[in-house]
Structures are given as structure tokens and as C-alpha cells.
Amino acid sequence: MSRLWLTGYRSYELGVFGSQDPKLLVIKDTLKKLLIGKLENGMDWLITGGQLGVEQWAAEVGLALKPDYPELKIAMMTPFAEFGSNWNENNRGTYAQLASRVDFHQSVSEQPYHGPQQLRNYQEFMLTHTDEAVMVYDLEVEGKPKYDYEAITRFAEQHAYPLTLIDMDWLQESANEYQENSNNGSQFE
């Protein structure tokens, strides 16, 4: 069994607004290619959070891959109970719909948010229940994922825990490839 933690930027940090944003199509295509490679090398659990952005997109991509990779299991873990309750109705609905479709959905803490220790406990849980991490994160473009990056690198100093960073250069290369394939009439989902 191989378990992958996938996390990264929130949608607003990447300037992605709406499901038809060209940036989102490139990000999802990048995640799809990466996940297929991981699946073909033995990954069977995709474990992500519920944040708006990379985490929800990863769950969506994983769900789209399940027909071709029925062995894939997807877990959506959140740091605390009532996660996302302060979001607008549309975002809450998207989150609830995703949570109902994944194989496993649970909060690390059964309490509503009451402090940053819950977030640290979440990071510790994710690190000790996965075998590697992938982050859509660039060291030169800080954002909320900085805290997960720091936790992962500290953990990796003491444990064999690989981290793959999908940085802005990787995303730009993916965008160029996506555009080239679109111009050549290749089909992307």
C-alpha cells in the first residue's frame, strides 16, 4: 500500500476563479499526469484535504481516474469538525458533494476550530499516515502551503519521506504543452 498526501495553493492564491478558467484546466491536467505516474508505480491511496483549490482539484482528478484505476482510493481529511462552514453556499455545496463521493472522509479533530494546534495535529496526522507528498507550491511564491511545506521538510529530515514540488516553472511547461496539444487538436479532459 502506498499513500500520497497531495496539497498546495488555495484557488485565490493561484488566481483561479471558476471551473472553466484556463489555469485550472492546466493544473488538473498536470495533476492527472502526475497521479497516473504514481498509480502506475504502486500508489493506491490519494489523501488530500478539503481546501478550496489544489486539494479539491486533486480529489476531482482522482475521482475522474477511478474508472481506469479502480484500485485507487481517495480520502479527504480535514483538520477540524465543521470544516468550511464559513464558506459561501456554492463552495459549501461543492465541498459536500466531493466529500460524499470520496472513499473516506473524516476530520482529524472532532471539535470545531478552536486554535492552531488543530492545524499542527492535522499536519502530523497527514505525515504519519502517508508515504510521500506532492505539493503544488513554489518556494519563490509563498502562500498558505508554506506551513505544510515546512512541516514536510522537518519530517523528512528524520524519515524517508519524498516530496515532489510542482512549482511555477513546472506549471508553465505544462501550460505550454497543453496549448501546443490544443493547437494540434489533441484531446484533453
Curated annotation (Swiss-Prot):
Gene3D superfamilies: 3.40.50.450. SUPFAM superfamilies: MCP/YpsA-like. This is UPF0398 protein LVIS_0849. Pfam families: YpsA. Signal peptide: none annotated. InterPro entries: YspA. Belongs to the UPF0398 family.
